[in-house]
A protein has these predicted regions:
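Short loop/edge segments at beta-strand edges and connector loops
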Residues: 46, 125-127, 197-199
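Short "lid" loop at the C-terminus of a central beta-strand within the Rossmann-like core
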Residues: 129, 174-178
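Conserved beta-strand signature within the Rossmann-like core of class I S-adenosyl-L-methionine
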Residues: 167-173
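Class I SAM-dependent transferase core
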Residues: 3-69, 112-119
Length: 256
């Protein structure tokens, strides 16, 4: 089975329909990924068929976990080689996609991919905690997503400040997610979100790999103290036993 037919078939197994034209875009993306990976560190997965499932199909699980409104502003935090942002944009060309990463050379590669497959996306060279303090980016996205970037209590502090009221944060992770989510639940609440659901998936690979998408919705403004400095976020992450400092009335105000 060739790569395009493999993608169409495997995506169908998770309930996502990929058209031949979209499969062609994914093929170009994969070719560039594997070619550029020989000179820069983009992915540890170098087998084309494995990459189709563990990068492309895995990214597409987001479409089944979260209903994204038309023309939504979506930011992919710590996008790396473009997952899940670029697969999402291929399938949903209406969204306004922003790709955020701390390494500029990755963003150069992603701009090359976007040009090659004919999609538009904004690339931003910033650390996530810097983006969360930027008034042009803070609380301005309908959806923030991240794929296996960090533990949930750290990831939440990176991503939640970027989403607007009633927006969603979708975290994509492996089998550890349910335990991480329980541990981080109070931290997530302190940042302004409530956990809506956790959606399990089994990837259609030989290992039947287990994946989860945790969906959180923003119902309170994120207190201005978050995100903290990057070193503090990782050295002193917000734990389950977080002592929550009461925010201002504005921070507590719920959207109606």
């Amino acid at each position: 089975m060739d790569i395009k037919n493999l993608l169409i078939s495997k995506a169908k197994e998770i309930g996502v329909k990929v058209s031949p034209a979209q499969a062609e875009q994914f093929q170009i993306y994969l070719d560039l990924l594997l070619e550029r990976n020989t000179v820069m560190n983009l992915t540890a997965i170098t087998d084309p068929e494995e990459a189709v499932i563990k990068h492309f199909v895995d990214s597409l699980t987001l479409l089944k976990a979260l209903e994204i409104k038309k023309n939504a502003k979506v930011i992919d935090v710590g996008t790396g080689a473009g997952f899940p942002g670029i697969p999402l944009k291929i399938m949903r060309p209406d969204i306004e996609l922003t790709l955020l990463d701390s390494l500029n050379k990755r963003l150069v590669f992603l701009r090359e991919v976007c040009d090659a497959i004919g999609i538009e996306a904004e690339t931003i060279h910033k650390r996530a905690e810097e983006a969360g303090k930027d008034t042009k980016l803070r609380e301005s996205f309908d959806v923030a997503t991240a794929r296996a970037v960090a533990n949930m209590n750290i990831l939440a502090e990176y991503c939640i400040p970027l989403i607007k009221m009633k927006g969603y944060f979708a975290a994509m992770k492996g089998p550890s997610l349910p335990d991480e989510l329980e541990y981080a639940r109070k931290a997530i609440a302190s940042l302004g979100c409530d956990v809506v659901k956790t959606v399990p998936f089994i990837l259609p690979d030989e290992e039947q790999s287990e994946r989860f998408v945790a969906v959180m919705r923003k119902l309170r403004f994120t207190p201005k103290m978050y995100p903290r400095h990057g070193g503090t976020i990782t050295k002193k992450p917000l734990f389950f036993c977080l002592l929550y400092t009461s925010p201002s009335p504005r921070d507590m105000r719920r959207s109606r």
